[in-house]
């Protein structure tokens, strides 16, 4: 990450500053603990930037820990994807990668300690009965008939669970806390359950697995985490976090702090909903450029620096709010405006024939890669008698506000000559197929000699030398700002979130590598698709338009 990216301030950093100043901690140690059951999304990026950013700014450490206690939903594929995403975002984890499964033996021992202290018991109620006995927010829970078993009996039953003596759902280990607590999480939560599932790290060693709330706090303590930072939905869980650590023999006592998660307009963040989009083929996979996943954003053309900048701009607070999608687009637009080389591409082509230009001549024009950055160099663009221009850049008649090509009037071709539309040719349906023009051969890089004003400039590519390309115009995945609030979120999908065009690009783009970004002049920012683009079949993804036009129509 660039040192030029300014250090932010927020309430968590203020807590850390105080802890360091009063000697509560001498250093800072954070962690990012994803469950490897899916692909990371832009909401995770906020947590990554917060946890790794804090460690970076305070010369501390940040662990990457996989919270892998649910083997049925986890996979090595997700482990590798998460590692790649964190690295791509510009961060390095401290030491070796951690897994909660590394601590399964230790976690088991702590569960035994709670049993010996009379603070945990094996319950043989069914999952439905446990839910029923737990009560509601308005009604206290009631004790399980198995709650008062002796430690000796519970130890024997827990060993039986470990040894495969219970079927799934027939027994679990619960913490013995308070069934009348006003906090549901404290009503004897389940801390171990039976699962006969192969684990991607421990194979078939275990048939019992610890629950998140039991595992998380102990993993933090074992790793020496000083500040355990999570989102607000875990605020009540902090009571259980502290209870577990207070009742086992362990040296480190981390503190949990909560911040508001990221809610972004025109998308969903729920893994369940994202998975539904993939499973029902409503998108083309987890890395579909319309998805809010980091891999999807990356494929669409978002840079790691733009995502870090977005996370910095939205800040870290305890207040839940909805962030405008335009804020994310603004970050990548600013980045690419500064750093993306320019190129010309015609997305909806119509042919121009310059009748007074020699048919056999191929002129090589030198064009700057960036108007404000000469250090980015130049490229060669071929100019020929026939060129493609955008269909929208020509009208038979137009008012004075239209600064493009009009029949009988002039316009400048970007980096080339002034041309004049002399006549047109139409097909049987009345559609214009060809525009016949003349050119002023004294206007390459200069104004007309007679002083006449040519105000419009349009882009173009050589019809003979341009490369055909598939152009994918990506837009917001949903038509409403908060699709998650809809009765059927899938019904709010934007049918125009992907429009595919067959256009032409200048030949220099054949050299573009996967994820290479360009500004297609006057059109938007695009990148080479990392999955489908090939040397003989180019594919470009629109990352973002030149300006925010969502919900706006042309005047």
From Swiss-Prot:
Catalytic activity: tRNA(Gln) + L-glutamine + ATP = L-glutaminyl-tRNA(Gln) + AMP + diphosphate
Keywords: Aminoacyl-tRNA synthetase, ATP-binding, Cytoplasm, Ligase, Nucleotide-binding, Protein biosynthesis
Binding site for L-glutamine: 67, 212
Pfam families found in the cross-reference section: tRNA-synt_1c, tRNA-synt_1c_C, tRNA-synt_1c_C2
InterPro entries: aa-tRNA-synth_I_CS (IPR001412), Gln-tRNA-synth (IPR004514), Gln/Glu-tRNA_Ligase (IPR050132), Gln_tRNA_ligase_bac (IPR022861), Glu/Gln-tRNA-synth (IPR000924), Glu/Gln-tRNA-synth_Ib_cat-dom (IPR020058), Glu/Gln-tRNA-synth_Ib_codon-bd (IPR020059), Glu_tRNA_lig_a-bdl (IPR020061)
Gene3D superfamilies in the record: Glutamyl-trna Synthetase, Domain 2, Glutamyl-tRNA Synthetase, Domain 3, HUPs, Ribosomal Protein L25, Chain P
Short motif 'HIGH' region, span: 34-44
Cellular-component GO terms for this entry: cytosol
Record-listed E.C. numbers: 6.1.1.18
Family to which this protein belongs: Belongs to the class-I aminoacyl-tRNA synthetase family.
Subcellular location: Cytoplasm
Biological processes per GO annotation: glutaminyl-tRNA aminoacylation; glutamyl-tRNA aminoacylation
Keyword check for Nucleus: no
Subunit structure: Monomer.
Gene that encodes it: glnS
CDD domains for the chain: GlnRS_core
This protein's name: Glutamine--tRNA ligase
Domain of life: Bacteria
Chain positions recorded as ATP binding sites: 35-37, 41-47, 231, 261-262, 269-271
Entry's Gene Ontology molecular function annotations: ATP binding; glutamine-tRNA ligase activity
Motif 'KMSKS' region mapped to chain: 268-272
């Amino acid at each position: 990450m660039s040192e030029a990216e300014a250090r932010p301030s927020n309430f968590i950093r203020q807590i850390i500053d105080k802890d360091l100043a009063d000697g509560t901690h001498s250093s800072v140690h954070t962690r990012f603990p994803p469950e490897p059951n899916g692909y990371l999304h832009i909401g995770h990026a906020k947590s990554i930037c917060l946890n790794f950013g804090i460690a970076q700014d305070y010369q501390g450490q940040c662990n990457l820990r996989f919270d892998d206690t649910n083997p049925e939903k986890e996979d090595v594929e997700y482990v590798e994807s998460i590692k790649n995403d964190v690295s791509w975002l510009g961060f390095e984890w401290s030491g070796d990668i951690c897994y909660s499964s590394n601590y399964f033996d230790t976690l088991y021992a702590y569960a035994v300690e709670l049993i010996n202290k009379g603070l945990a018991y094996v319950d043989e109620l069914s999952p439905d009965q446990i839910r029923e006995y737990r009560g509601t927010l308005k009604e206290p829970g009631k004790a399980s008939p198995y709650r008062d078993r002796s430690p000796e009996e519970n130890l024997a039953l827990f060993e039986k669970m470990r040894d495969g003596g219970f079927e799934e759902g027939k027994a679990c280990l619960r913490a013995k806390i308070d069934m009348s607590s006003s906090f549901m999480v404290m009503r004897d939560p389940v801390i171990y359950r039976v699962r006969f599932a192969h684990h991607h790290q421990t194979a078939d060693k275990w048939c019992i697995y610890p629950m998140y709330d039991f595992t998380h706090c102990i993993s933090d303590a074992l790793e020496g985490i000083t500040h355990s930072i999570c989102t607000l939905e875990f605020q009540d869980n902090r009571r259980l976090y502290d209870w577990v650590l207070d009742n086992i023999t362990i040296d480190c006592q981390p503190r949990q702090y909560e911040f508001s998660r990221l809610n972004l307009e025109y998308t969903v963040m729920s893994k369940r909903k994202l998975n539904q989009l993939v499973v029902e083929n409503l998108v083309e996979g987890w890395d579909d450029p319309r998805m809010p996943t980091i891999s999807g954003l990356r494929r669409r053309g978002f840079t790691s620096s733009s995502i870090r900048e977005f996370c910095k701009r939205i800040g870290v607070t305890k207040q839940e709010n909805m962030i405008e999608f335009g804020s994310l687009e603004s970050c990548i637009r600013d980045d690419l405006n500064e750093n993306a080389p320019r190129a010309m591409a015609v997305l909806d082509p119509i042919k121009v024939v310059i009748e007074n230009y020699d048919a056999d001549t191929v002129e090589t024009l030198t064009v700057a890669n960036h108007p404000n950055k000469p250090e980015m160099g130049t490229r060669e663009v071929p100019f020929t008698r026939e060129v493609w221009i955008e269909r929208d850049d020509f009208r038979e008649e137009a008012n004075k506000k239209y600064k493009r090509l009009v029949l009988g009037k002039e316009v400048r071709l970007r980096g080339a000559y002034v041309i004049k539309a002399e006549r047109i040719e139409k097909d049987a349906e009345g559609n214009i197929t060809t525009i016949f023009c003349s050119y002023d051969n004294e206007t390459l890089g200069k104004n007309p000699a007679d002083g006449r004003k040519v105000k419009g400039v349009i882009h173009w590519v050589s019809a003979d030398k341009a490369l055909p390309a598939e152009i994918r115009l990506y837009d917001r995945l949903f038509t409403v700002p908060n699709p998650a609030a809809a009765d059927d979120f899938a019904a709010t999908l934007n049918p125009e979130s992907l429009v595919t065009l067959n256009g032409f690009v200048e030949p220099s783009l054949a050299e573009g590598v996967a994820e290479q970004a360009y500004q297609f002049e006057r059109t938007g920012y695009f990148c080479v698709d990392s999955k489908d683009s090939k040397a003989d079949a180019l594919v470009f993804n629109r990352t973002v338009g030149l300006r925010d036009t969502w919900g706006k129509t042309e005047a």
